[in-house]
A protein has these predicted regions:
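Short, flexible active-site-adjacent loop segments at beta-strand->alpha-helix junctions, enriched
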Residues: 55, 87, 121
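Helix-adjacent hinge/juxtasegments
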Residues: 67-108
Length: 121
């Protein structure tokens, strides 16, 4: 348990990147793997990850994530992940009260958090 808390204490939200230093594909794959292993309601896994390392694709996607002048750090970022919430149909056998609940935003947040913790490691 203490290893986990050490990881939580070390994690940071990095905004300073060297655009000339690529991120190793294996590190990106491990982060994505950690994200895919996140818990989700009824194992719905309502997420898709697009790992962007191609400079041309990154140039097309950056403006979509920089609305209101935010996320300017992406201009220097050599790789990033786009997390997409996918629609899921959760079969609820235990209770009808849960059938119209939207758990996907919470599940996606869990998944993205695990991606970030893996990046810290």
């Amino acid at each position: 348990m203490s290893d986990y808390f050490d990881l939580v204490k070390r994690r940071e939200s990095c905004r300073n990147f060297d655009p000339n230093r690529p991120v190793e594909p294996e590190k990106l794959r491990r982060c994505a793997e950690a994200a895919w292993l996140a818990p989700s309601a009824c194992n719905g896994q309502p997420w898709k990850y697009l790992i962007v390392t191609n400079p041309e694709l990154a140039a097309k996607l950056r403006p979509l994530m920089q609305g209101l002048g935010m996320n300017k750090f992406l201009n220097e970022c050599p790789a990033f992940a786009v997390v997409v919430q996918e629609p899921t149909v959760i079969k609820v056998s235990a209770s009808q009260r849960l059938k119209d609940q939207d758990f996907a935003p919470i599940d996606v947040a869990f998944s993205a958090s695990q991606f970030c913790y893996a990046a810290t490691e």
